[in-house]
Amino acid sequence: MQKTYLLALVSLLASSLVEARSTIADQTRLDVGGSDESFDGIDGIDPNNSNVLTHKLMDKVIASSELLSLHRSLVEIKSISDNEQAVGGFLMDYLSSKNFTVEKQYVDYDDPTGKPIRSNRRFNIYAYPGDSASPGIILTSHIDTVPPFIPYSLSHPESDSFKRDDILISGRGTVDDKASVACQIIAAMEHLEKHPDIPIGLLFVVSEEVGGKGMSTFSDSRLNSGTYHTIIFGEPTERALVAGHKGMVSFGIRVHGKPAHSGYPWLGRSAVSEILPILAEVDRLGDIPVSQGGLPSSEKYGRTTLNIGFMSGGVAANVVPEQAVAKVAVRLAAGDPEDAKDIIFRAIRNAATKHRKDATVVISNGHEQPKGDIEVIFGLEAYGVVDIDADVDGFNVTTVNYGTDVPHWKIYGDNVKRYLYGPGTIFVAHGKDEALTVGELEAGLEGYKTLVAKAAERERT
C-alpha cells in the first residue's frame, strides 16, 4: 500500500515538472536558427527560472552563428583609442586561421605639436587571400572605440514571445564599429568561397575616433597601391548608403588675462569675461548668412553647425581669471575649410575688439610663447564636405553629420567608387546604451554582400 502510494506520488511530481517546463516553454519561446525551439532539452538548470533559460538560449543563438560569435569576440575585447593592440592581435589570429595573408602596419603616435612618436603598441591590419596583395575591392572599418568600456551583454524584449532577431546585443563597439568589422569579414569570406578569382582586401585601422591617424598612415604607405576600383567603408548608417557627410574644422581659443584680487577687479583683466562674448559670436556663425559673416550652408547638407564642447577658466572665485580656454568643433556644410578658418578668425577678432579695443588676436600653434592676448589654435585635421557614391539599387540613401575615415584615404587612379554603409544607428553610438539587434546585424551582412557583388560585377566588366 505504502509502496503504491509512493509510486503514485513520484508519478504526480514528474507529471507536474513536465507540465511546468512546457508552460515555461510556451510563455517564453524563441526562434533559433529559423525555427521555433522551446527550452526543452536544456539540462543542468532550474526549469522554474525562465530568465536562466532565456539567457541560455540567447547564448546558444550567438554561439551557433559565425557572424554573431565573431562580433561577440570583438566586443568583449577592450579597444579604446590608442589601446587597440589586443583586438588587433585577435583579428590577426582569426584572419590567419581563415587562410588570409595578414600584414601588420604599426601606427605612430603624435606629440602635441604633431611630431610622430614611434610605437610598436598599436597597428593597422591589412589582409588579403593568398598572394593577392593588391585586390580591386577593399572593405575597411576601424577597430578603436570611444571610452568608457562597456561589457558585452544580451537582453530581450519584455514579451511572452520573441524571435531571435529581437535579441539586443549591448556594449561598447557593438555598433561603432565592430558590427561593420564582423559583417565585412564574413561577407568577404562568403564571397571568396564562391568567387576565389575576384580577391577582396580587408583593412582594419586604429585611431579613427581620435583624428584618423591609422587611415592616414595606411594612405601614405606602400600598401595603398592604387589598384582598387571599389572601397567600402563601414560605419553605422542604419543600413543606408551615405551620399556624403559634412566637413570638419576644429579650433581652440585661449584668452590671456591679468590676475588680481576679486575685491579689486579693476587691477586685473578677466580672461573669462573676455572669452564669453567671443564664444557667443562663434556660437551663431552657423545661423547667419555668409554675407553677414557667417559660415556657409548647402541644400544637400543643411547648415554648418558648431559645438562649443569644452570651456575652462580661472582658479578660484576670489581671483580675477588669468586664463580661459574653449574648444570648438565645426561641421562644415559647404565651402573650403581654409575659407571657414578665415571666417572664424574674423568673427573672433571682431568680437574681441568690440569688447576691448586694444585686444590682440593671433593664430597660434598653441605651443609657442603667445604673441597676443587671444590665441586662435586650429586643429591639424580639416577637410571640406565629402561626397560619396550611392549608386547601388535596393538601399535607402542619406547624408550624415559625423566624420569618417573616408577623407583620410588618398585615392590614386580614376573612377574609384567609395561607399559608406553599416548596421546600427549613430544615435546610440558613443552612448551608454550602445546596442543593436541580432536582426540588424544579420541584415547588415546582407547589405555588405550586395555591395561586394556589385563591386565584383565592375571587376568582371
UniProtKB/Swiss-Prot annotation:
Tell me where on the tree of life, at the top rank, the source sits.
Answer: Eukaryota
Give me the Gene Ontology terms describing cellular component.
extracellular region
Q: Name one GO biological process term.
A: proteolysis
The entry lists its GO molecular-function terms as: metal ion binding; peptidase activity
Q: What is its EC number?
A: 3.4.17.-
| Entry binding sites for Zn(2+) 1 | 176, 209
The family line of this record is: Belongs to the peptidase M20A family.
Supply the name of the protein.
Probable carboxypeptidase MGYG_04702
Species in which this protein is naturally found: Arthroderma gypseum (strain ATCC MYA-4604 / CBS 118893) (Microsporum gypseum)
